[in-house]
Amino acid sequence: MEKTYDPKAIEKKWADYWEKRQLSKPTAQGSPYCIMLPPPNVTGTLHMGHGFQQTLMDTLIRYHRMKGERTLWQGGTDHAGIATQMVVEQQLAQEDLTREDLGRQAFIKRVWEWRERSGGKITHQMRRLGVSIDWSRERFSMDEGLSRATTEAFIRLHHEGLIYRGKRLVNWDPKLNTAISDLEVVTEEVEGHLWHIRYPLAEGSGHLIIATTRPETLLGDVAIAVHPQDERYQPFVGKKVRLPLTDRTIPVIADEAVDKEFGTGSLKITPGHDFNDYEIGQRHQLPLINILTSEGYLNENVPEPYRGLERFEARKKIIADLQRENLLEKTEPYRVPVPRGERSGVIIEPLLTDQWFIKMEALAKPAMEAVESGELKFIPKNWEKTYLQWLSNIQDWCISRQLWWGHRLPVWYDEEKNSYVGRSREEILKKYHLSPDVKLQQETDVLDTWFSASLWPFATLGWPEKTESFKTFYPTQVLVTGFDIIFFWVARMVMMGLKLTHKIPFHSVYIHGLIRDSQGRKMSKSKGNVIDPIDIIDGISLDALIEKRTHALLQPKMAKTIEKMTRKEFPNGIASFGTDALRFTFCALASRGRDINFDMGRIDGYRNFCNKIWNAARFVTMNTQEKDLNPEKPLSYSAADEWIRTRLQQTIKNAEEALSQYRFDLLAQTLYEFTWNEYCDWYVEFAKCILYDKQAKPAQLRGTRVALLEVLEILLRLLHPVMPFITEEIWQTVAPLAGKEGKSIMVEHWPQFNIHEMNYDAKVEIEWVKNVITAIRTLRAEIGISPAKRIPVIFGKGDEKDKKRIAKMKSYIKTLGKVSQLRFAKHDDCFSATATGIVERLEIHIPLAGVIDKQTEIARLKKEISKLQKEEEKSLKKLDNPNYLQRAPQEVVEKERLSLEKTQNALKKLQSQYASIESL
């Protein structure tokens, strides 16, 4: 093994090795275990959320593969309709072309060319993360099989009357000219205005005043709504007002949805351009007026002076005209929530359009029953409530998009606009008994990306055909995903799975938190706080990081702020940490049900953990290679050997429990504590006492060498699911020494807990001697004895058991405690000039004479005592102040009391030491 651990030297080697030998294929004979990768966008690059989620999935997959299960991690990418179309359109724009210039077929050809050329970036990055996906089965949501499955699903749902075409309000992106889902809308609060507008009464004098943040939609108003219990407006309900700037009158209606406290308490109702107004309009059977074109210009349904104006230009003119006609009461500043398209960046409009929908109520009921009956489980369980609430309030799903890239709807129209659904023109002619001469035009819309994504768990396995893969791996075991897509993806997969396969698509849903920055903020390009996981693995210079964060910002003015923040947070850029340190960090941070604030300090600690493992493995191999490890010869285990073997069994049990409960954080904690605190810090040091003892017998040496090797080899297998690269590299050296043969640790057996390997007496003895050594080390540190200086130790009190243990563990205590000589106290020993510690009944005394410099130590103690006395005085002053006790929060007062207690205890200890040293 090399002297230092260099992840760059090994990671690509082992990733290529695993893939070349197809070790991720489901070849084992055990029970099937399958996880579906939430397909990342083909346009995407790996971000921290991907890295976190895929680490958790890979940990599960590697664990179950090692348990001998027939394990499949089904991977693939999503065609990402809007995102991909935008990327290719931007490329065309650089050639001064539009998609319309190319035409649909040529444009689709260009998209496929782009996908072949650039679409594999994210899967390459995933390989860097070490994910053990079966790449030979990789799917793409637009490949032939998945396209066939998507068409089949649409046709079956339509045949059952669950798909229909209708006019409804949708999120409309005027730049992309398509409907988009709620998930593709990003709402941000900006400084805006609240305009108070007078609506004159149609009869008599007077007016009602409404407050709005969107005066341009006034031209589509069809009513004024007030709360039925609002006494101010009860006399006006049923009357009419004149709609400003038009020749229309509209009614005043009462509806409980109106917020009496907002604005003036009266609300303009524009059902064609507001989702809440649409619901009110439906209840009161109000007309729907659409005043916008698909590009966001005012249409022919508005008075002539406003036709053709861009929506925000129209706003300016309407405000000016209202002022001129004395209909603008006042304008006040107001924080306005503005919905923007995630991809286009433009403000989204609720727009009334003809779209295709799925009736969701009938699909939602069995999906709810699956959770209520316990057939489908959420982890943590509290997410079941969120899932059920969403499904109980479900609306019909708009599945059509006005794009060119995607699954085209299997719908054709004749010249009379009659629609026909089928797999092809030929099938439709036959199915509907149409003349071969009839002219049929296919629907230009494509399906929402989430529609094909909802089929992912079974379509990727061959559905609608009953393939071997489908029969073996469906339903899958667990879905690992974030809470933000429980409704958009999880619930829809459950509904589609139950409807089309009559089975739930997975037995469990593990919901993880979102990765945020160190301050708890969501990571986003606009905030400039995104960290690329590959940059953590490989490292990146400060200049390159700033360039990456400030390039192609939607708001270029943020560049200076982002640069300043980046320089402060990463003054030296980001160091190279390697994949295993990053993966271990992700697992360690994966507390159930909580978002994760990513702290670079944690990953620095886990890089040190990698180094610790490496150095321990080097020590083991250096002390076992070409040594006598003959299993035929007798061996004798020391108490420390028995102790570490016992602790290993407990670690196996704890790791198994943590994984079975999806407690990745507890898994990491268990492995870290055993590896660092017990194997490296204690056992390796205990082993040296045997290995470096010239009096040690061959059987003792063999016992310790075998224990070092066997425990390390098993520990590597426990660590492997989380840290695949370093464990594979070390295992390839360690396994032959431990008498194991195999092509990869990846397909070795997961360690089995064996209660017969546990020696409780050795456990008690070694924990006792650890406490004794720790007490000696603590006393040395407290009185300032150099770590290299050997000291005498006298034991007082204790019993026969303690004496036997000390005799047995003498070499451990002397070596690890840096003790020159140790003995039990005599009757005439005086302990006034000693530092004293206690372990159970045993007293530990370090004579101070000749061990320390009296005057130097007295000066140091005086300084420390003075410092603590000032802290004590400060705390007492606070706690004696009645005002402080009354006004400060209870938890602050309690914290101060605990601080005082801690200070006083430390003070007593130092004063005792001072008295002891002064008496020398």
Swiss-Prot record:
GO MF term (any one): aminoacyl-tRNA deacylase activity
Reactions the enzyme catalyzes: tRNA(Val) + L-valine + ATP = L-valyl-tRNA(Val) + AMP + diphosphate
GO BP, sorted A to Z: valyl-tRNA aminoacylation
Residues that, per the record, bind ATP: K525
Annotated motif 'KMSKS' region, positions: 522-526
Coiled coil: 642-668, 849-920
A GO CC term assigned to this protein in UniProt: cytosol
Any Pfam family matching the protein: tRNA-synt_1
Record EC number: 6.1.1.9
Keyword Cytoplasm: yes
Enzyme class: ligase
Residue numbers covered by motif 'HIGH' region: 40-50
Alphabetic keyword roster: Aminoacyl-tRNA synthetase, ATP-binding, Coiled coil, Cytoplasm, Ligase, Nucleotide-binding, Protein biosynthesis
Cellular localisation: Cytoplasm
Main location: cytoplasm
Function: Catalyzes the attachment of valine to tRNA(Val). As ValRS can inadvertently accommodate and process structurally similar amino acids such as threonine, to avoid such errors, it has a 'posttransfer' editing activity that hydrolyzes mischarged Thr-tRNA(Val) in a tRNA-dependent manner.
HAMAP family from the UniProt entry: Val_tRNA_synth_type1
Family to which this protein belongs: Belongs to the class-I aminoacyl-tRNA synthetase family. ValS type 1 subfamily.
UniProt free text on domains: ValRS has two distinct active sites: one for aminoacylation and one for editing. The misactivated threonine is translocated from the active site to the editing site. The C-terminal coiled-coil domain is crucial for aminoacylation activity.
NCBIfam families: PRK05729.1, valS
Quaternary structure and partners: Monomer.
Name this polypeptide is given: Valine--tRNA ligase
Gene source species: Coxiella burnetii (strain RSA 493 / Nine Mile phase I)
Organism ancestry: Bacteria, Pseudomonadati, Pseudomonadota, Gammaproteobacteria, Legionellales
Gene: valS
